[in-house]
Amino acid sequence: MKNWNRKAEVAIIGGGIMGTSTAYYLAKRGISDVVILEKDLLAQASTGLSVGGIRQQFSNPANIRLSQQSVRVFENFKDDFGVDNKFRQVGYLFLAQKEETWNDFLSSVETQRKHGVPVEVLSPGEIKKRWPYLNVKDLKGGTFG
């Protein structure tokens, strides 16, 4: 690495989705003296090499709202950034084997629906019908959204 001696108003460590997003939104707010410090090439580390996933099935309303905003960003990515990110929503299936986990899922579903998250509550039989390759023998149920 070259000797680099420069000052910046903001230094961001990491050029993945969090670092580049932070730099982008700082620039939108008029803070342009920003440097991103990344050891790899951009989009060549964990973010760029991941298959990615955005879910809205959280128990905390703040996390739900953040993920809903993320979905909007990814849905509009091509229009806003000129790059087709090939975003498509296919859903997340969460499975519960323990009664306590199942009760937590059901409680979370109430919160999710209250915040506009389209989520389904599924019995083991419904899960088996949609995903016949899954072993549902020990399941209490699942949620899909």
Residue ranges and their predicted role:
Residues A27-T47:
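Glycine-rich FAD pyrophosphate-binding loop
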Residues E38-A43, G82, R130-L134:
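Short beta-strand/turn micro-motifs at beta-sheet edges
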Residues L26-A27, Q112:
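Hydrophobic alpha-helical packing residues
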Residues G52-R130:
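Dinucleotide-binding Rossmann-like beta1-alpha1 core, especially the glycine-rich loop
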Residues N3-M18, V35:
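Beta1/beta-strand and adjacent pyrophosphate-binding region of the FAD-binding site
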